[in-house]
Design a protein with these regions (language model features):
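A short, internal acetyl-CoA/4′-phosphopantetheine-binding micro-motif in the GNAT/acyltransferase core
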Residues: 72, 83-92, 120, 228-236, ...
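A short beta-loop-alpha structural element at the N-terminal edge
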Residues: 3-17, 163-176
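Conserved acetyl-CoA-binding loop-helix of GNAT-fold acetyltransferases
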Residues: 87, 93-106, 133, 230, ...
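A short helix-loop-beta-strand connector motif used in the catalytic cores of GNAT acetyltransferases and
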Residues: 43-58, 67, 81, 195-205, ...
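Conserved beta-strand-loop-alpha-helix junction that forms the acyl-donor binding cleft
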Residues: 92, 118-127, 232, 261-272, ...
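Conserved GNAT-fold acetyl-CoA-binding loop/helix
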Residues: 23-45, 177-200
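Conserved catalytic-core motifs of GNAT/GCN5-like acyltransferases
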Residues: 119-121, 137-151, 263, 281-293
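Conserved GNAT acetyl-CoA-binding A-motif
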Residues: 108-121, 251-263
């Protein structure tokens, strides 16, 4: 018998264990969630606009949570981000993953999302088949996911001559959007997300003689580094590594101890080398999928 219900606060320890279990096994890895600590889970969900219980789901058997799934749908965004589905090993083979996925898609549709984006570990063949059977299409190239512990960071001491790094403000919206669209022409972050990030003080800009050269956004709730981008004329000049290093140092002044993640195209060799030099450790490689609604 299937017992699907909304996610509750009391479910967090069990869901965290499902996340840890999957992350430790390449054939079971998913792009969401990547929680390894209760603090990471609490921080991310606390920042959601809607109650997580409205769009996240668990499967309960005899009082125990044995499956997890759902979506995040944020105001102003056209897509929903898929979480899971994750199923405890002893309960697999009962179509629980399919059920969780179908219910997740229904919640995305009910929230007005135009598509669902999912990511699966490159070796998670079962998860890939599940998505493809539900109509998801493979999207783009594989992404490498990294994590950085503050104690492992190797900062860049000296930046390119004449380049300054500062925290952006609401007045920098146009400049940040111009950098974003130039560096990420296929990016899906809406303007409202950039406006909110600038207002929250999580966006950093690199400039020279008043001209924007690079941008990066470090989200303290997701503990994630988004959109490290450098304009084409300044690439391979050390600007990207410098803005990232300065942004990280400033971030950790206010959030000491936070372990941060990021993802980058697995074939972007210059970026991979940059992250390795600064101490980032590889976590997993994921493939992206999309389901139009």
């Amino acid at each position: 018998m299937k017992n699907l219900r909304g996610f509750r606060r009391a479910d967090r320890p069990a869901v965290l264990e499902l996340s840890r279990h999957a992350l430790q096994r390449p054939t079971e890895q998913v792009g969401n969630p990547l929680w390894t600590t209760r603090d990471e889970l609490e921080s991310e969900l606390a920042d959601w606009d809607a109650d997580p219980g409205e769009t996240l789901l668990v499967e309960e058997q005899d009082g125990d949570v044995v499956g997890f799934g759902g979506v995040e749908v944020s105001p102003g965004w056209e897509h929903a981000d898929l979480f899971g589905p994750l199923v405890a090993p002893e309960f697999r083979g009962r179509q629980l993953g399919t059920m969780l996925l179908e219910a997740s898609i229904e919640r995305a549709e009910a929230r007005g999302a135009e598509s669902v984006l999912a990511s699966i570990g490159a070796r998670n063949l079962t998860g890939r088949l599940l998505l493809e059977r539900a109509g998801f299409d493979h999207r783009g190239t594989a992404n490498a996911v990294f994590r950085l512990n503050p104690s492992a960071h190797r900062p860049v001491e000296d930046g390119p001559q004449g380049v300054d790094v500062r925290r952006g403000s609401a007045d920098d919206l146009d400049a940040a959007l111009e950098l974003y669209h130039e560096c990420f022409p296929e990016g899906v972050f809406p303007d409202v997300a950039w406006r909110e990030s600038l207002e929250d003080g999580t966006v950093y800009l690199a400039e020279a003689k008043g001209k924007g050269l690079a941008v990066v956004n470090i989200d303290p709730s997701d503990r994630w580094i988004y959109h490290l981008g450098v304009i084409e004329s300044e690439r391979s000049h050390g600007v990207g590594g410098y803005v990232l290093s300065r942004a990280l140092q400033d971030y950790w002044d206010g959030h000491p101890g936070d372990v941060l993640g990021l993802s980058v195209r697995a074939d972007n060799l210059p970026a991979l080398r940059l992250y390795r030099r600064q101490g980032f450790a590889p976590l997993l490689v994921v493939e992206s999928f999309e389901l139009p609604l």
